[in-house]
């Protein structure tokens, strides 16, 4: 099924030979996390599938660039189980049928092109390449470089929003964030602490500087002079306070005399007594 004129290989992730036929692999990871792939050689899609080579061969579907007439192999494609031809990949933006995913069964679908005849693909007779001729699909919903339809409802596999958030690693990180935060809080505490210590050091430096200034000041006779002034002032202030306290004592005494002498309230009590009688 692999001809010289169409040199795709199973793990060709480049776009040098036309559209990136494995563009969907990143969007719908097939059993291996992106983190696990870092630094490793890219796995062939057939090695990623739970069913191994048989499932891989059963799901192949020809996608060609413009120079090819027969091609192999294509990305594993997911298509709605019930695929009316009103929508580019089958299904309509309104009936939600594009959410039902299955491996393509090689029978062709008008959703992939106006004339998609039945062809057994890899299940063809031995000796024939059995690949289906590619018929360009109608343009509705397609965008470059690889035609993943736009306009599907949010939350479907075809939605540009949900591909990463709902099924990809970003979503997983979000859901396991409680664990993540615990670690972060610890680090935050450390940072806060170290900042605090830094501030303390700053304070120490400041106080040392302040002390030096004071030493320098004390040399000046002006400062001694002003200290004497302060002392005089404070003495005067004390005298004032003593005077104040004498005054206040006096006023308290006067108030007391008023009450202890003829009470202004005694008149009232006498009247009340009369009433009771």
Swiss-Prot record:
Residues 169-190, 211-220, 238-259, 268-277 have a biased composition (Basic and acidic residues). It is found in: Secreted. It comes from the Eukaryota. Residues 95-114, 162-277 are annotated as: Disordered. GO terms for cellular component: extracellular region. Keywords: Malaria, Repeat, Secreted. The keyword Membrane does not apply. Residues 221-237 have a biased composition (Basic residues). KAHRP might mimick human histidine-rich glycoproteins to anchor host thrombospondin or a parasite analog in a binding complex with the endothelial cell receptor. This is Knob-associated histidine-rich protein.
């Amino acid at each position: 099924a692999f001809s010289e004129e169409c040199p795709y290989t199973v793990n060709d992730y480049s776009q040098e030979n036309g559209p990136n036929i494995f563009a969907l692999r990143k969007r719908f990871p097939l059993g291996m996390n992106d983190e696990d792939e870092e630094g490793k050689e890219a796995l062939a899609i057939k090695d990623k599938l739970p069913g191994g080579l048989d499932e891989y061969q059963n799901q192949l579907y020809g996608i060609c660039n413009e120079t090819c007439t027969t091609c192999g192999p294509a990305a594993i494609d997911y298509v709605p189980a019930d695929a009316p031809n009103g929508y580019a990949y089958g299904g309509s933006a309104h009936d939600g049928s594009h959410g039902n995913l299955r491996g393509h069964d090689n029978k062709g679908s008008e959703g992939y092109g106006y004339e998609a005849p039945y062809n057994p693909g890899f299940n063809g007779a031995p000796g024939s390449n059995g690949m289906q001729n590619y018929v360009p699909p109608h343009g509705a919903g397609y965008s470059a470089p690889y035609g993943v339809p736009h306009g599907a409802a949010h939350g479907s596999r075809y939605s540009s929003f949900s591909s990463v958030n709902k099924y990809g690693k970003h979503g997983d990180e979000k859901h396991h964030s409680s664990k993540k935060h615990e670690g972060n809080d610890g680090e935050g505490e450390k940072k806060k602490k170290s900042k605090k210590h830094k501030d303390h050091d700053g304070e120490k430096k400041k106080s040392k500087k302040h002390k030096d200034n004071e030493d320098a000041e004390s040399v000046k006779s002006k400062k001694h002079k002003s200290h004497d002034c302060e002392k005089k002032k404070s003495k005067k202030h004390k005298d004032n306070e003593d005077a104040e306290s004498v005054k206040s004592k006096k006023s308290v005494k006067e108030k007391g005399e008023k009450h202890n002498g003829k009470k202004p309230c005694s008149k009232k009590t006498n009247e009340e007594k009369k009433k009771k009688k």
